[in-house]
UniProtKB/Swiss-Prot annotation:
One of its GO terms (cellular component) is cytosol. Nucleotide-binding protein. One of its GO terms (molecular function) is nucleotide binding. Belongs to the YajQ family. CDD domains: YajQ_like (cd11740). Transmembrane segments: none annotated. Keywords: Nucleotide-binding. This is Nucleotide-binding protein CHU_2278. The keyword Nucleotide-binding applies. It holds the Pfam family DUF520. It comes from Cytophaga hutchinsonii (strain ATCC 33406 / DSM 1761 / CIP 103989 / NBRC 15051 / NCIMB 9469 / D465). Coiled coil: none annotated.
């Protein structure tokens, strides 16, 4: 029986490449001249740490990072934007955790969408991925198209199509 897996993963090397391009853009932009701006990636904890002088620059930097991630093929939903910035002396800091894996609520939402579609497929939750099996590949492709059109709150990738 054909099947595929639904996951939410961010390739750390691709993320690092996107951040390197963002750093290079910030150093060449006129409005960031002589600014003490830093973008660091903690690969173990999967957190992007941004430090700059004021909140206006912080918003611009976050926009640059999201744009560069999109150009590298990383969905903006992979970043947890809920953490607000905080001040540390004259600097403003912000941590952007990178989401890896699908949480329980999103799994339930995805499975409900699949079951409500009426297709003859079976979703099964396995840790941080969802395996969808069906009798026809066409049914699986319909589910992929359906999930791409819906907003489930996480960046989804479809892998292991067999």
């Amino acid at each position: 029986m054909p099947s595929f897996d639904i996951v939410s993963k961010v390739d750390p090397q691709t993320l690092d490449n996107a951040l390197n391009v963002a750093r290079k853009e910030i150093t060449t932009r006129y409005d960031f001249r002589d600014s003490k701006t830093e973008i660091d990636l903690d690969k173990k904890a999967s957190i992007i740490k941004v430090t700059t002088e004021n909140s206006m620059r912080m918003n611009a930097i976050v926009d640059i990072v999201i744009t560069r991630m999109a150009k590298q093929g990383i969905d903006a939903k992979a970043l947890d934007m809920s953490k607000e910035e905080y001040a540390s002396g004259p600097m403003v800091k912000r941590e952007l955790p990178v989401k890896n894996g699908i949480d329980k609520e999103s799994c339930k939402k995805i499975i409900k969408i699949i079951k409500d579609s009426g297709s003859k497929v079976t979703p099964a939750q396995m840790d941080d991925l969802i395996r969808v099996t069906g009798k026809k590949i066409d049914d699986l492709q319909e589910i992929i198209a359906l999930l791409r059109s819906k907003d489930v709150g996480v960046a989804l990738q479809f892998i292991n199509m067999k």
